[in-house]
Amino acid sequence: MKNWTDVIGKEKEQPYFQHALQQVHLARANGKTIYPPQEEVFNAFKYTAFEDVKVVILGQDPYHGANQAHGLAFSVKPEVAIPPSLLNMYKELTQDISGFQMPSNGYLVKWAEQGVLLLNTVLTVERGMAHSHANLGWERFTDKVIAVLNEHREKLVFLLWGSHAQKKDKLIDRTRHLVLTAPHPSPLSAHRGFFGCHHFSKTNSYLESNGMKPIDWQI
């Protein structure tokens, strides 16, 4: 069975990837605060092995507030206030999954360890400046991640929320994977169709119908 090193190891040797790492390193060296911390940039791949991926939830770029981002899309450290988008995800879960209790924290490692790849399309951000690293080359890398999952795995669930995530639809073969789309869970758009999308129960129904263990969404 392939692992992350097999499928994207060579990508890390590409000039564009080295350039992205170098730009982030320079920014840190020049005293800028970059999130997440250096040792947590690739946490999505640390917590969810390639062969264990069942579900992919795409985010855009990391949270840009202090102590929030730790390398998993939508997730924050246990002691940090739950951000609005994640709070709306929890609200949908309380309606969608029988018995789901509103969590007291936003630390989603439990999802990641069950095979939910929480992948931001851009892996770093400067403090207080959303999308500040959007042009560093990270998206080329994360597009490759999506492409290799599409190619080398079968029957994954891709949750694409909002227009940015939905641009990645073209990288996914819908005859071999389940793609679910909805507006972004942010307070600006959640009421336009994220609430009531039932993506969490639909994900579990698909997994179970294909002989896989459902995700325990409770945090």
Curated annotation (Swiss-Prot):
Keyword Cell membrane: no
Lineage top rank: taxon: Bacteria
Keyword Hydrolase assigned: yes
Subcellular localization, as worded in the UniProt entry: Cytoplasm
Active site: 61 (proton acceptor)
Reaction equation(s) it catalyzes: Hydrolyzes single-stranded DNA or mismatched double-stranded DNA and polynucleotides, releasing free uracil
Pfam families xrefs: UDG
GO molecular function, one term: uracil DNA N-glycosylase activity
PROSITE patterns: U_DNA_GLYCOSYLASE
One Gene Ontology term, aspect cellular component: cytoplasm
EC identifiers of the protein: 3.2.2.27
Annotated keywords: Cytoplasm, DNA damage, DNA repair, Hydrolase
GO biological processes: base-excision repair, AP site formation via deaminated base removal
Function as written in the Swiss-Prot or TrEMBL entry: Excises uracil residues from the DNA which can arise as a result of misincorporation of dUMP residues by DNA polymerase or due to deamination of cytosine.
Similarity remark: Belongs to the uracil-DNA glycosylase (UDG) superfamily. UNG family.
HAMAP family linked: UDG (MF_00148)
Name under which the protein is recorded: Uracil-DNA glycosylase
High-level lineage: Bacteria, Pseudomonadati, Pseudomonadota, Gammaproteobacteria, Pasteurellales
